Amino acid sequence: MNQPSLSLPSFAKINWSLEIPGKRADGYHEVKTLLQTVSLHDELHFELSDDRAVSLSCDNPDVPTGSDNLIVRAAHALQERFEVEKGIRIRLEKRIPIKAGLGGASSNAAVTLLALNRLWEINPGGGELFEIAAKLGADVPFFLLGGCVQATGTGTTLSPLPSAPDPLRQYLIVITPNAGISTAAAYNALDSRALTTKNANPILSVSQSEANSGHSQPWTLEDSLENDFESVIFDIEPEIRRTKEALLQAGALGALLAGSGSSVFGIFAGKEDQQRAANEIQLEAGWRIFPCVTVSQTEYLRAIGS
């Protein structure tokens, strides 16, 4: 007899803005960021098993599938928290580049929480999934919501913001270069320099006031893009800087490092400009290019069935 199963997309993210105002006494960094889901995505397939075993397979041999993978950790966290006696077989079709600042692992973990909540019929109380998600990683709670969300504190205090309707969606190109840098190395490099002391990026302040007032005003994203990691990472890996230069030379209205890198995204005026640029950009060896669009919270929740 076939076991109950479920397949869900697992979307990537970019950061419209990412500021690190300082480091807290507990060693964690303060974060001010504006996160956005985009259409680039993995696929996760779940099938119940007769025992409590959690197994993971992946079509990308570079992705570890053992107990350290966030997908497996998410499943075990649910089993332990709610004393689940069922198991799960999970298959990951990996399309989001790994260790590229696009939140792939965090997205996979969040989608696993949502899928197993349904397949294992857990029905947790309010906030319990978010609590588990926050323990798995700073970006995991965001992927329970999707869309455009402001994150502050250590990155787990979330404030959803008005998402643009489909006609105003943003057309993007993401480039992932061959060079990479770990999140830990990025933070270490940032710590060696003065952290942000200026006021919050205008996009954060304006967006928060819109959320509070219930009125949305057009954003000039290309004028507000900011990432505190850019200067240090561009110095460490000049190849990553060249991806931004390539996007701007191809006509991007603005371009920015995604998260702590190594991917860079560019914003284009529309679908035609996006397609033209994707065909014209001269890719260096090992570079990967991903044309995509923003995914609103409504679209996101519909896609993952929440």
Outline where the language-model segments fall.
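Short, basic/glycine-rich phosphate-binding loops at helix/coil junctions
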Residues: D50-D62, T112, A134, H215-E226
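Contiguous, small/hydrophobic- and glycine-enriched helical/loop subdomains that border
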Residues: G87, A109, L113-Q150, T154-T157
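Glycine/serine-rich anion-binding loops at beta->alpha junctions
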Residues: R91-W120, A138, L253-F268
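Hydrophobic C-terminal alpha-helix "anchor/cap" residues
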Residues: L35-V38, A133, A246-L247, I281
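Residue-level signal for inorganic ion chemistry
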Residues: W16, L44-F46, I71, A105, ...
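ATP-binding N-lobe of GHMP and related small-molecule kinases
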Residues: M1-A100, R118, I122-F130, T152, ...
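Conserved, helical-rich catalytic subdomain that frames metal- and/or nucleotide-binding sites
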Residues: L145, Q150-G254, A269-S306
